[in-house]
């Protein structure tokens, strides 16, 4: 809507992505601050709290009545801010909003099952995976159909490794499903997934803006993805909404994001990596998500093959809890790792 004040009323400042991204950030931030307390009160009245797993560390027992599904609020804030500030006829805006909405709805279904059944077990892993694959494949197929570049790039190389063709749909789907699950796994402590997600989105927004800017992409030898820069507005809105959510999610959390939040965040982070041609650099940008996921894979693999556990508990943040680390210490140290990883990722811009 804001862009059309430029195209129809001639208000020049509204043509700039940077201005509209800033506006989207603050709109989403204040919407989250405004509606989050109301949602918390409503969720408490409805007893919409996710039951704590019997296998969780002892310290988690005190979180038993904390409301969940906070993702609904920051998804809503993101969508509204994006609708107000972004060009709604842009492929990359529409696809990004579709990712947030589809993955958020899958997470909402999972959250609802947990709350209604008073159980930590939501949708079966097979059903949830099927939904995620269908959502990821739908968006990936749309991107491919409408001409999204299918070249695969690796860090530090200005030339594409190969052209994936229709296989790009499978690859992009894999990236979205894997990343959404990785963020979901990480979301186990207050604010642990929120801040690394903000770092990742900020870094990826820089890459997407460069990819959509003819001058910058040429200067930095970065793949040019025409019109992709508009997706930065959606990303800025999500960052603003997440910071508003963090106000209530920091330790001790008044609200959890739930699967509705973590799956939508993970799906959108993957989407931003895909349209900026950073699928492999995502391992560095999302280092905390990778570490958490690998710890689970190693734990399961070791137990099934050797009958022994590598960690005291997985994901690895629980390992440190069992070792006696304070929750806040684990969270802040993981934030530091995420910050350093994203700084390094941004430095790769000049290494081509």
From Swiss-Prot:
Keyword Cell wall biogenesis/degradation attributed: yes
Keywords, ordered alphabetically: Cell cycle, Cell division, Cell inner membrane, Cell membrane, Cell shape, Cell wall biogenesis/degradation, Magnesium, Membrane, Metal-binding, Peptidoglycan synthesis, Transferase, Transmembrane, Transmembrane helix
Annotated membrane topology: Multi-pass membrane protein
Subcellular location: Cell inner membrane
GO molecular function annotations of the record: metal ion binding; phospho-N-acetylmuramoyl-pentapeptide-transferase activity; UDP-N-acetylmuramoyl-L-alanyl-D-glutamyl-meso-2,6-diaminopimelyl-D-alanyl-D-alanine:undecaprenyl-phosphate transferase activity
Major localization class: membrane
A cellular component term, taken from the record's GO annotations: plasma membrane
Entry cofactors: Mg(2+)
GO biological process: cell division; cell wall organization; peptidoglycan biosynthetic process; regulation of cell shape
Reactions the enzyme catalyzes: UDP-N-acetyl-alpha-D-muramoyl-L-alanyl-gamma-D-glutamyl-meso-2,6-diaminopimeloyl-D-alanyl-D-alanine + di-trans,octa-cis-undecaprenyl phosphate = di-trans,octa-cis-undecaprenyl diphospho-N-acetyl-alpha-D-muramoyl-L-alanyl-D-glutamyl-meso-2,6-diaminopimeloyl-D-alanyl-D-alanine + UMP
Functional pathway: Cell wall biogenesis; peptidoglycan biosynthesis
InterPro entries: Glycosyl_transferase_4, PNAcMuramoyl-5peptid_Trfase, PNAcMuramoyl-5peptid_Trfase_CS
Domain of life of the organism encoding this protein: Bacteria
Its EC number(s): 2.7.8.13
Matching Pfam families: Glycos_transf_4, MraY_sig1
TM spans (from-to): 16-36, 66-86, 88-108, 129-149, 160-180, 191-211, 228-248, 255-275, 280-300, 329-349
Family, per entry: Belongs to the glycosyltransferase 4 family. MraY subfamily.
UniProt xrefs under HAMAP family: MraY
Function: Catalyzes the initial step of the lipid cycle reactions in the biosynthesis of the cell wall peptidoglycan: transfers peptidoglycan precursor phospho-MurNAc-pentapeptide from UDP-MurNAc-pentapeptide onto the lipid carrier undecaprenyl phosphate, yielding undecaprenyl-pyrophosphoryl-MurNAc-pentapeptide, known as lipid I.
NCBIfam families xrefs: mraY
Protein name: Phospho-N-acetylmuramoyl-pentapeptide-transferase
Gene this chain is encoded by: mraY
């Amino acid at each position: 809507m804001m862009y059309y004040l430029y195209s129809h009323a001639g208000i020049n400042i509204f043509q700039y992505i940077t201005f509209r991204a800033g506006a989207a950030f603050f709109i989403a931030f204040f919407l989250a601050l405004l509606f989050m307390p109301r949602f918390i009160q409503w969720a408490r009245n409805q007893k919409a709290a996710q039951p704590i797993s019997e296998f969780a560390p002892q310290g988690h027992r005190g979180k038993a009545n904390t409301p969940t599904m906070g993702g609904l609020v920051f998804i809503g804030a993101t969508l509204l801010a994006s609708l107000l500030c972004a060009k709604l006829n842009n492929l990359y805006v529409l696809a990004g909003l579709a990712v947030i909405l589809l993955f958020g709805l899958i997470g909402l279904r999972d959250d609802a099952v947990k709350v209604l059944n008073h159980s930590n077990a939501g949708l079966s892993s097979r059903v949830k995976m099927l939904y995620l694959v269908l959502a990821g494949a739908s968006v990936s197929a749309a991107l491919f159909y409408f001409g999204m570049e299918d070249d695969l790039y690796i860090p530090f190389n200005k030339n594409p490794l190969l052209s994936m063709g229709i296989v790009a749909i499978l690859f992009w789907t894999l990236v979205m499903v894997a990343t959404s699950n990785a963020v979901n796994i990480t979301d186990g402590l207050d604010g642990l997934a929120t801040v690394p997600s903000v770092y990742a989105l900020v870094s990826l927004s820089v890459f997407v803006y460069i990819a959509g800017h003819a001058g910058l992409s040429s200067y930095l030898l970065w793949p040019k993805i025409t019109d992709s820069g508009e997706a930065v507005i959606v990303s800025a809105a999500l960052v603003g909404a997440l910071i508003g959510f963090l106000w209530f999610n920091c330790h001790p959390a008044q609200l959890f994001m739930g699967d509705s939040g973590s799956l939508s965040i993970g799906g959108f982070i993957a989407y931003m990596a895909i349209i900026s041609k950073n699928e492999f650099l995502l391992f560095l940008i999302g280092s905390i998500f990778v570490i958490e996921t690998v710890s689970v894979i190693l734990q399961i693999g070791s137990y099934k093959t050797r009958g022994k556990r590598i960690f005291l508990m997985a994901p690895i943040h629980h390992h440190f809890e069992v070792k006696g680390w304070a929750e806040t210490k684990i969270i802040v140290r993981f934030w530091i790792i995420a910050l350093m990883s994203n700084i390094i990722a941004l430095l790769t811009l000049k290494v081509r």
